[in-house]
Amino acid sequence: MVRYISTRGGGEPRSAASAVIKGIAEDKGLFVPDSIPALPFKPSDMTGRPYKDIAKAIIGAFFDDYTEEEIQACVDGAYDSKFEAEDIVPVVKAGGAYFLELYHGRTAAFKDMALSILPYLMTTAVKKENEAHKIVILTATSGDTGKAALEGFADVPGTEIVVFYPSTGVSEVQKRQMTTQTGANTHVFGIKGNFDDAQTGVKEIFDDAAFNKKVEEAGCRLSSANSINIGRLVPQVAYYVYGYIKLVERGVIKDGDPVNIVVPTGNFGNILASYYASKMGIPVKQFICASNKNKVLTDFINTGTYTTDRQFYVTNSPSMDILISSNLERLLYHLSGDPAEVSSLMEQLAKEGEYTVSEKIRNGMSRLSGGYADEQETLDAIAEIYRRDNYLIDTHTAVAWKVYNDYRERTGDETPALIASTASAYKFAADVASALGMPEEKDGFAYVRALEKKTGVPVPSGLRDLDKKEIRHADVIEKSALRDAVLSSVK
């Protein structure tokens, strides 16, 4: 059985169900599998099979304390008519690559792929573990996770969900998605700060034993819907496996041939899922980690030194406006195999704002390439791929495509590439419209309508008429007031 252990070595190994409920380990580390399971099938044997079949097999391999029937029920509940694409994840050839379109769920972002199933995994885990407390989901968001988590957990019995977002660091559409969220158990707060402030605040709450005791006295237990929760990460592995199978199915590659994987990266969870897919047996030649002007990961990959002592930029790809990439800790654990080393690096980051990794970890990063695109390059990429292929992409996907093109020019590597397309262009309609040379509109919602008229690409139903919905969550709080907000939400 796969057990879940902390990246920092503390606590006892846990079942998947226990790790999903707990969210973060007792020693502040993140849960990782003690071994990564092998692919439970040969990719060529799965061609033509629906996404649900792939997801069931991959999630079941990691979460083997769930019964086959439990995993099937979770998958069936998650990947249904909530997704507007019949095949859940279309794989589209454009711009010299293959785009994994991960944004056809209810909130038009890749977070739906995991956050549609996490509530089912969580409620199943609660039953399996005989958990008597109400589960309070705490989530920090740079824009997309918050809405996807709210949509997933809204009115789920036995749960409350509390979301914190940077009040001035998300797009107009993203903000309206969260502030209009329905559900008696949903609580949304803008904070006066950036995503790192929100994420750090949430982590501090998890680490505060006295505060957790107060929450327990209210009959509740804290958990997370961020990618620090292993229940968020594992479902993401499935779509990289599915993308590989699709390329085999179409004759782009033969089973066993390598691919490159390109991911616009903020908190490092999405690209880490592709690393897990490769450890299972999907042949990956290069992982290409694409950043915006907040290029902390690009610099780390190129130098081995991670430093947060740098200017923070608000960009047109806000979901990557991050300086502290939480999931990188998991990769450091897998590459070092040494929880004491990981613990020491995380301590250095907390105290000094930087760390430098060992030669062993550097050597383990040989298949990881880093690059970045600034805001103008991002807009140019949107215009270029639309001109070339009539293909509409959002700002984050544009960063990935630009960085991939730079990599290909630099290396001459023509290995077929899967690019994670992480959000609908309509979530960032103003910037996309600007890239396409369209006239200015009065607000983000007018840009949505104008962009649909120009391109003929339908607006996702979850974004249509968003500006006409009632605002239900208008609170903006100081970054020091997160604990009070949580307590007010659970009473």
Predicted regions and their residues:
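PLP-dependent amino-acid enzyme catalytic core
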Residues: 1-491
